[in-house]
Amino acid sequence: MAKANEIKRGSAVSYNGKLLLVKDIDIQAPSARGASTLYKMRFTDIRTGQKVEERFKGDDILDTISLTRRSVNFSYIDGDEYVFMDDEDFTPYHFKKEQIEEELLFIPEGGLPGMQVLTIEGQVIALELPQTVDMVIEETAPGIKGASASARTKPAKMSTGLTVQVPEYISSGERIRIHIAERRYMGRCD
């Protein structure tokens, strides 16, 4: 049991008879005095895969479920299944493409360090990514000299199909860091 304001992204809760995995949380602070802060949570139903959205007050009590997290690396593709290998005991974890379609946009060809598989009682629930990923820009409009003074952005496409907005001075072939949850440019990589 935990209060709604203690729930974090990647947690699992039981609510209205459903097992839900927290994908995103929006915090809405009230403008009136005495009103309580609202937590708008977006979930994925673990059993059905459906997206669910609920609102909670900060002191609402939710029933939390303990998850097991295992560090994994991307191994290979088998038909429409993606196989991830446990870093310690080499257990393979299989995901259908539909299950991890969003996550695949952030996994470059060489893999992504820091990935984890979430399980409940041995059942694979989800693939969790780290907060940031470093990727090389495949395609963007040419960089403009002296554009660092302006705050204008342009779209940049990565090899995985992901498109993010980058500053005008960034060129194709540059390595950038992307914040995964917010899908935004954070800076250049060394």
Swiss-Prot record:
Q: Which GO terms describe its molecular function?
A: translation elongation factor activity
Q: What SMART domains does the entry give? A: EFP, Elong-fact-P_C
Q: Which Pfam families match?
A: EFP, EFP_N, Elong-fact-P_C
Q: GO BP, one example?
A: peptide biosynthetic process
The lineage's top-level taxon is: Bacteria
Entry GO terms, CC: cytoplasm
Give the family, as the similarity comment puts it: Belongs to the elongation factor P family.
Name of the protein described by the UniProt record: Elongation factor P-like protein
The species is Photorhabdus laumondii subsp. laumondii (strain DSM 15139 / CIP 105565 / TT01)
